[in-house]
C-alpha cells in the first residue's frame, strides 16, 4: 500500500518540485522513482506554455493552413498534454510523459519553432540539365533489366499514405534549408530539384538528430490534428524510424546517421538544400537492382524509374564528362559465388589497389571474420551503404545486403555483378578514392544489353530484433 511521504523526512525542495508537477502529493514510490528526474521536471514546470502555443499556431498557419482546427483547440490539446501527468499514476507512463515533455521543452523551438521566423534568402544554384537527351538511353538500360517475373499470388505489403504528407513536405522543404548541416535529402524530391518533371511522394531524409526531430514533428501533428501519432522503429533497417497516424498511414520516415558519416556523404547544394550527390544515388540505384523486389517494382512502373535514371545519367554526363559509347572494358567484374558460405568473390585488380572483394551475404559472419583478422580499421557507413567495409592485405571485406541474382546454376547474373561493382564504388566515393574510370565502364556496360532471365536468387540476410515504437496517446516507449 502506497503512503504519502513524510514532509519532515524528505527534502522539501525536491518534494515541492514533484508535487507541483503532479498536482498532488506524491506517494512514497512516486517520490523515490521520480526524484532523479527533478531537473527535467523543473524544466517542464517553468516552460513557457504560452510561447509554445504561439509557435505551434504559427507552424499551423504556415504549413497546415488547410487543416480544419481552431486556435483554441490547439491550445487545449497542448495544455492537456502538459497536465497529463496529473491524471497518471503508473510509474512507467509517468517516465514516458516526462521524457517526451522534456524533448518538447528543450528542442522544439530550435528544431521546428525556428521555421516560423524569416528565412535567409535562397541562393539559386540550379544548372540547366538536358535530361531529355538521356531518356532513350535510360529506357534502353532499364528495359534490359526488366526481367522480374511477378508472382500474382504474392501478397504485397500495402503502403498507405496519409493526406498530411503534402503538409509535411512543405514543412520539410523549409526544414532542409534551415538545418542543412544536420539534414540532407535523397530520392525523388532531391532529383525533382534538378528536374521539375520528376514525381515525388514524401521527402527522403538522412539526419543526425532523427529521433528528436520525429518526436517534435509527431507532437506538432498531434496538437494540430488531434490524431494519435505513432513512431515506429524497424529492426532490419538500421537507425530507421517512421511516423504513422492512428490508421497506420505513412507520414514521413528518416534514417539517423552519425555526424562523421554525414561529413563524408557526397552532396551538392541546390537552393539552400544539400542533396546526396546524384552520382552516389545512381550507384545506389544500380546496387538496388540486385534486389529482386526492386526489379519487381521496375516491372510495375518502368516510366517512374526512367525519369529518375535519365536525370541521374544527365547529371553524371554533365558533371564527370562521361561519354556513353558502349566501351565497358573490364565491367562486369568477374564474380564467383560460394552459395554454401554465402560469399561472392569479385575480381577488382583492374580498377583498384585491392585485388579482390569478398562480399558477404551474412553480416554476422563478416563481423566474426573481421574479428579473426584482428583488424580495427573497418569503416561503417551505417544506412548510407548499409554495410561495413574493410581493406586488409589487398582484399576488401564487405557486407552486401541485397539478394544475389543468378542467370544459371552457380553463375552470378550481370545485374548483380553490376550491383556489386556499384557497392564498391560507393566506398570509393565515401573515402575520396578513384572511381571515375570504373564508373564510366559500369554505365557503358549497361548499354545495348539483351534481357537475361533470372534463374534463381539468394535470400537476403535475416535481421534479428524486435519492432520498437513510441505511442504518444498511450504513454508507451518500447525500444
UniProtKB/Swiss-Prot annotation:
Ca(2+) 1 binds at residues 202, 204. Ca(2+) 2 binds at residues 202, 204, 253. The keyword Repeat does not apply. Pfam families: Pox_polyA_pol (PF03296), Pox_polyA_pol_C (PF12629), Pox_polyA_pol_N (PF12630). It is an enzyme of class 2 (transferase). Coiled coil: none annotated. Heterodimer of a large (catalytic) subunit and a small (regulatory) subunit. Belongs to the poxviridae poly(A) polymerase catalytic subunit family. This is Poly(A) polymerase catalytic subunit. It comes from Camelpox virus (strain M-96). The gene is OPG063.
